[in-house]
Structures are given as C-alpha cells and as structure tokens.
Amino acid sequence: MEHAVLGAGAIGGLVGTAVASLGESVTLLVRSERLPGYPANVSVERPSGAITAAAKVAVTLANPVDVLWIATKTYQLKMALQAVHSLPRCIVPLLNGVDHVEVLRAHFGHDRVLPATVAVEAERIAPGRFVQRSPFVNLNLAASGEQVLGGIVARLRDLEFTCKFIQNEQTLLWSKALLQHRRLHYGDLDCCDSRKGH
C-alpha cells in the first residue's frame, strides 16, 4: 500500500516510521524549508528498541495514495491541506478534538475519512528522528476502516502498538477529548498525547 503522512512531527513521524518499517511505501509531507538535507532513513527511539526505515519526502502530494495519515496541529489543518493535490483512498486523522472530522469530510468526502485517535508521548528531536517517551502507543480507529486498514493494524500490533477498531465514532472521538479535559482540569501528570517538535 502507498501511505503519506501530512504533519511529520512527533506523532506523524512516529506513525510514518512504524508503517515504513513494515515494508510499506511511505511519503512524509514536510514544509519546503525542511526538504533540503532531510534524511532518506527515518528512525524512532523507543523503550522497546529503535526502528529505522526508508521513507520518501515531498512538499506536496501529487499522486493518489491508499492512506493519508494526518497529524498536524488542529489550527494548522486547513492550511496544511493545501499540500494535498490528489484524492487519497482513505484519510486517517490523528488530531486532538472532534471538529476536524467534519472539516475533512467536507474536503474529501464523508466515506473517505476514518476517524482515529492516538495516545502516546513522543517528540521530534531532529528532521527524520523521533523519540517515543511513553511505553505505549494506543491507536483507536473507526470500525468503518477495518476492511482497508485491518492488515496494517494487525502488523502494527507486532510493533507493540495497542490497536482497536471502535464501532461508534462519537464514542471514539469524545472518549479521548473527555480524558484530555479531565487531565488538564485535575492536573494529572500522565501525558496521553505529546506533540513536540512539529
């Protein structure tokens, strides 16, 4: 399958590297100023051991891909979408909040967007170099994407990702939003989703 990652910071870089390490074709979409000198191999340092993989890098997505993973910050989404010049088979957003799903469905079409959430503490320490700080990566996806993503999700479990397909999209999205609100409100120090280095 052909994959692209829009927002190759901490979260996007981690996911993109993991997918590429499984032998999938991955293109990281980066800002033009970061393109020169971007490494041909990307890596993630993890508590369970580092992974390294080859990945392509581009400023825009000109050709269709099977999966477009989106991991921009929410306020950057609309501007970032200007880099996507083709229509992916499916779009998997890993943003915080819930409003981005309707934005993406208006842009790409309802059925192409497969809501998802990710919980991990990660950091981009240099172009193409990422660190997973937490011992876990929890990836939950809408059950509507199981036919397309079931194979890749099963292989991500081999990399110690905890992955689930959730039947109810609202439950999927709001459960994380409420968890983040509780942690912010009560000062819980556990970091569920750290997006440093975008």
Specify the residue positions occupied by each region the protein language model found.
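Glycine-rich beta-alpha junction loops
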Residues: 33, 98, 117-122, 145, ...
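Internal alpha-helical scaffold of NAD(P)-dependent oxidoreductase catalytic cores
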Residues: 87, 106-112, 127-198
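Residues at the C-termini of beta-strands that transition into short coil/loop
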Residues: 30-32, 59-61, 95, 117, ...
